[in-house]
């Protein structure tokens, strides 16, 4: 065999080893990036939001300790998702509230009352992780039974959350999170926060 053939094979074998080593490192780096990318380290840049509160339990279905635990959980998940995460509970009819907006939005059925309130609440407080009216989500859970016999909730999404969540995804989150809300409101709202974070970062 020609010495040149032997040298060539050694040359190829040498670089094949380094090529495979570099390829393996590149794959490991990509995996680490993917895992790290699931959580955000972005700082909140919205300076115009008029409140630091995220738990508005107007229906008084949570204890003070449960509210505080939710605030801690929400703060953690906000950093992970780079989204504001808000909870509002009510126990009142929204029929009169929604009627004010019918000239603008058209006739509203009772299941849409919560939509109007939730969207307005988000905008009025200028929620948004990156900017006012920016990235975030708000769950409005109204415990009141409207005239049609229904009890309604709404998931309001904005910015990146709106881009991420289709209507079917929002419905699925609400259905799963609020399945046992009557028996365990705190557990339901914890599930809302956790599910949103999972679905937002998966």
Task: Give the role of each language-model region.
Residues 18, 22-26:
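Alpha-helical transmembrane spans of integral membrane proteins, capturing the lipid-embedded, hydrophobic core
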